[in-house]
Amino acid sequence: MAKEKFERSKPHVNVGTIGHVDHGKTTLTAALTTILAKKFGGAAKAYDQIDNAPEEKARGITINTSHVEYETETRHYAHVDCPGHADYVKNMITGAAQMDGAILVCSAADGPMPQTREHILLARQVGVPYIIVFMNKCDMVDDAELLELVEMEIRDLLSSYDFPGDDCPIVQGSALKALEGDAAYEEKIFELAAALDSYIPTPERAVDKPFLLPIEDVFSISGRGTVVTGRVERGIIHVGDEIEIVGLKETQKTTCTGVEMFRKLLDEGQAGDNVGVLLRGTKREDVERGQVLAKPGTITPHTKFKAEVYVLSKEEGGRHTPFFANYRPQFYFRTTDVTGAVTLEEGVEMVMPGENVTITVELIAPIAMEEGLRFAIREGGRTVGAGVVSSVIA
């Protein structure tokens, strides 16, 4: 059979499985690919194909992640599944796989467990906007009342972390039985897919968001002015647009008088393009790497924020010793390092390599910042951790 052409017509959504070890995340991932492939096309993946997750690097951190894809009637999904708990923590904090929504897998036989709670908290901290629940292994529970109790417990847990526990779709099923071809449980997989389709809104595409370009380099071109280069992170820049230069110094206003790519002049540059932007009346020394160009009023510079961070273990090339309050590493945002002082949460004396923890950071220079911004923690150019801004303080 000839290979099918990849259809770009359906909107694309990123999801992933989260939940406690051995509650059936990988089995559910296999069931989704296998059962949806029968109806909507796509490739079925077996459990061991998914479980054998390849290593990848994100922000200098090695993570094992499996990527699969499947389709529903209206959408194309990319789905991530991780083999170990530490991989989930790293994946969610580094944003290696940005999720538009997560499928929380919880065993009906065991109910919510410590990692169920931890993954919900992480999802909240790193800004996963929607959670859908799959209660797995329901074939092992004969008592309908028990299923109801577990469902209530999951809803309460979601609500306690500011997710709308009462409204989150919860599908009761058995991934293993579905894989074995039990029609009633196969139906539950379709029910889960329908919940994904209806509950997670179609994500806004990067080009539709407000313009942002992290500055990588600055040149002065005689007779033309100052050019900054970088990759457009989101939105579109048109010739003639007013823009702001944000971060490290006072915010400056300027106008884009030219956009070029591969030495050709363009009318606009959009998300994903590596461009040079010509700035009217801006001096070479007023702009530097580490600032961003942005649509006016869409992003502001900040020095103080709360973050969720993962600290690399010694084996991963991280620190060999713990760090304490007032630790002062460099925080690498987008294209530059800024030194910052760390404050630990009340009752936390120190942070060991290999842990994930909430910290407050005060930078010595302001960075264009918003919730969800990812960063690396470095010491002398070596990555020792990764983090995500969970809230901006000042």
Swiss-Prot record:
Residue positions binding GTP: 19-26, 81-85, 136-139
Keywords, comma-separated and alphabetical: Cytoplasm, Elongation factor, GTP-binding, Hydrolase, Magnesium, Metal-binding, Nucleotide-binding, Protein biosynthesis
Region span, G5: 174-176
Region annotated G1, chain positions: 19-26
Pfam families in the cross-refs: GTP_EFTU, GTP_EFTU_D2, GTP_EFTU_D3
Physiological role: GTP hydrolase that promotes the GTP-dependent binding of aminoacyl-tRNA to the A-site of ribosomes during protein biosynthesis.
Ranges of residues in domain tr-type G: 10-204
GO MF: GTP binding; GTPase activity; guanosine tetraphosphate binding; translation elongation factor activity
Region (G2): 60-64
Binding positions for Mg(2+) per the UniProt entry: T26
Catalytic EC class: hydrolase
InterPro entries noted in UniProt: EF-Tu_GTP-bd, EF-Tu_GTPase, EFTu-like_2, EFTU_2, G_TR_CS, P-loop_NTPase, Small_GTP-bd, T_Tr_GTP-bd_dom
Subunit and interaction comment: Monomer.
Protein name listed in UniProt: Elongation factor Tu
Lineage: Bacteria, Pseudomonadati, Pseudomonadota, Betaproteobacteria, Neisseriales
Localization per Swiss-Prot or TrEMBL: Cytoplasm
